[in-house]
């Protein structure tokens, strides 16, 4: 007895069980296999991934850059040390500029919003989910789409009611053809 016949027999006998139906369906399509769980990306995890990506890019650029390679000649070594000290000075200047910019940002935030005080040492909560604006826009459904969706649901339920009523009439021994008054058989002929 195939799957469909089993289901019809259960419905006709009145022994239809939703739980059994779902189990049969899952066995048929192997839906009990474990699925890969997708964890939401936290802000800390995102920062960690970005940091690793940046480090990998700098390492690959260092390997491609011929100036960073040290030659065996001593003249080249002195030149590289001079450039490295210049680079360190430039980095120190950039760090001081960034720190002054950060303090300016903090004061702006404090003056604009007294309830929230953000500082570079404080971070957001580690388990906060990163939300997409696209999903928020898709969640908003217009009234016409909502009405269409509800009408489809109603028509689906009406079809289910019709099939169940047909099954009930078959079970009770009456035929639907003779009880439906909209069907006209034809004029009666008397001899």
Swiss-Prot record:
Residues 57-70 have a biased composition (Polar residues). Residues 71-94 have a biased composition (Low complexity). It comes from the Viruses. Keywords: Coiled coil. Residues 52-112 are annotated as: Disordered. Residues 138-172 form a coiled coil. This is Uncharacterized protein R292.
């Amino acid at each position: 007895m195939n799957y469909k016949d089993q289901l019809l027999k259960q419905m006709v006998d009145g022994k239809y069980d939703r739980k059994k139906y779902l189990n049969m369906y899952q066995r048929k399509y192997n839906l009990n296999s474990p699925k890969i769980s997708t964890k939401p990306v936290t802000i800390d995890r995102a920062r960690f991934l970005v940091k690793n990506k940046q480090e990998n890019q700098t390492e690959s650029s260092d390997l491609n850059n011929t100036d960073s390679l040290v030659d065996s000649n001593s003249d080249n070594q002195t030149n590289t040390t001079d450039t490295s000290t210049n680079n360190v000075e430039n980095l120190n200047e950039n760090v001081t500029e960034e720190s002054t910019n950060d303090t300016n940002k903090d004061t702006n935030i404090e003056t604009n919003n007294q309830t929230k005080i953000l500082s570079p040492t404080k971070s957001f909560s580690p388990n906060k989910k990163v939300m997409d604006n696209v999903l928020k826009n898709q969640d908003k459904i217009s009234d016409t789409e909502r009405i269409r969706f509800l009408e489809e649901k109603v028509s689906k339920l009406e079809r289910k009611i019709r099939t169940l009523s047909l099954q009930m009439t078959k079970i009770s021994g009456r035929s639907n053809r003779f009880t439906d008054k909209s069907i006209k058989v034809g004029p009666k002929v008397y001899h």
